[in-house]
């Protein structure tokens, strides 16, 4: 896809057209917000009920939770109160201890979405990460993920650790951590990688999933709406690349490809959605893309910054 091509996103037929063509930050971001708001409206009109959701944090930094809490339109409170019924999210749940995990177990007989961030440590039968204590017994991430995933209507991995292993599974990987799809040995999982995942992507994916079902995904299980185009194609510094004018050090305004930027090989929505509903994103802050949404991050994308040109 060339840099001047419009990105096309499949949306339902009732939106008057089968393709929604977007070529600007505003139009793409507007579509994502529409998806979340459409899900909320369906609940209000009684077309759909609020689906239960369990969000489990296993082994990782949980930057995805901080990212989610920074969502602005819709914000996380509106999302949780209007179109998903969040049963459990350890970082923000009021309940603690056995009471909290009991609610998780009670939800397993209902229709629910399972969201998970972090990788699963396998060493020593999973004892490197425990997520709860129940009836006097420690519940490992291995056990919890396997238990919750079994009856879930949909599974979404939030973040690169959950999706591909990410930093948690990076060398030397002393805990023998693996991604959720690898642990469960399933290929029907929706992956939303990112370090962290942008809340716009999470909100949009949840909105689409609750209103229309499984979105169109690429060969890695990532929704094409957010991972269907190279960062390079929408980068504000692309003109410098085309002119073969490259930055020599961090802080220069030119293309950072010679400094190790992975934008030309990384498929993500970053230049358009950006972060915190602002113009904030890595390249905009003079930091090369490190390819954090890909399956080889971080070991396969190092060094993140290099000097000395090509």
Where are these regions (language model features)?
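Long, low-complexity C-terminal extensions of enzymes
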Residues: 262-308
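Secretory targeting signals
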Residues: 2-12
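Iron-sulfur-associated redox domains of electron-transfer enzymes in respiratory
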Residues: 10, 14, 18, 22-267, ...
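Intrinsically disordered, low-complexity sequence elements enriched in Ser/Thr/Gly/Pro
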Residues: 1-2, 26
């Amino acid at each position: 896809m060339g840099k001047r091509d419009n990105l096309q996103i499949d949306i339902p037929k009732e939106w008057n057209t089968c393709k929604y063509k977007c070529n600007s930050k505003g139009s793409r971001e507007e579509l994502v917000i529409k998806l979340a708001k459409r899900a909320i409206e369906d609940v209000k009109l009684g077309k759909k009920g609020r689906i239960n959701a369990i969000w489990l944090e296993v082994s990782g930094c949980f930057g995805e939770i901080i990212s989610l809490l920074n969502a602005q339109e819709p914000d996380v409170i509106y999302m949780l109160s209007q179109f998903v019924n969040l049963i459990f999210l350890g970082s923000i749940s009021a309940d603690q201890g056995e009471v909290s995990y009991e609610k998780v177990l009670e939800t397993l007989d209902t229709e629910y979405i399972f969201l998970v961030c972090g990788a699963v440590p396998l060493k020593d039968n999973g004892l490197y990460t425990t997520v709860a204590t129940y009836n006097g017994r420690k519940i490992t991430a291995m056990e919890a993920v396997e238990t919750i995933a079994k009856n879930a209507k949909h599974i979404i991995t939030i973040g690169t650790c959950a999706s591909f292993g990410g930093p948690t599974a990076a060398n030397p990987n002393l805990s023998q951590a693996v991604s959720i799809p690898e642990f469960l040995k399933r290929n029907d999982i929706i992956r939303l990688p990112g370090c962290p995942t942008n809340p716009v992507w999470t909100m949009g994916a949840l909105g689409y999933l609750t209103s229309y079902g499984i979105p169109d995904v690429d060969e890695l299980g990532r929704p094409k709406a957010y991972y269907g185009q190279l960062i390079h194609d929408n980068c504000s510094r692309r003109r410098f690349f085309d002119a073969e004018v490259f930055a020599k050090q961090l802080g220069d305004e030119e293309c950072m490809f010679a400094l190790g930027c992975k934008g030309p090989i990384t498929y993500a929505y970053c230049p358009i959605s950006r972060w915190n509903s602002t113009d904030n994103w890595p390249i905009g802050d003079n930091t090369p893309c490190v390819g954090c949404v890909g399956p080889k991050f971080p070991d396969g994308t190092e060094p993140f910054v290099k000097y000395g040109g090509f």
